[in-house]
Regions:
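Core catalytic ATP-binding domain of two-component histidine kinases
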Residues: 1-123
């Protein structure tokens, strides 16, 4: 587990409602794994990943206390083959974008003033 090996804590803030969403669960599982992996890599060591859900609006949000995202990087995040990682291929966020668009989700990835970078998915 990438989080355990880096001393990263996971905090769950899940809504009490249990909404039903029609999605390809295997694709969404991979989306969530990719987002959490990116968060862990951004944090490095000793940080926190927060997974939050809400029912109204129906939303999944994954936030992290990592290094954040500059405005320059934010503008390029979903560009093919763009990566901030030394050996990154720049296809992870492209895959995520394609899955979310296929499911008619809206999404954003940006830093917030509280120091947490959030990937927000609205269904």
């Amino acid at each position: 587990n990438v989080c355990q090996s880096r001393s990263i804590s996971l905090r769950l803030e899940l809504c009490e409602e249990n909404p039903v969403v029609s999605i390809d669960t295997s694709l969404f599982e991979q989306v969530i794994i990719n987002i959490i992996k990116n968060s862990a890599e951004s944090i490095g060591e000793n940080g926190e990943i927060i997974i939050r859900t809400s029912a109204s609006p129906l939303m999944l949000e994954i936030g992290d206390t990592g290094q954040g995202i500059s405005k320059e990087v934010e503008a390029k995040l979903f560009s093919p083959f763009f990566s901030t990682k030394p050996n990154g291929q720049g296809i992870g966020l492209i895959f995520i974008r394609e899955v979310l668009m296929k499911h008619d989700c809206t999404f954003s990835l940006r830093p917030y003033p509280d120091g947490i970078t959030r990937f927000r998915i609205c269904f």
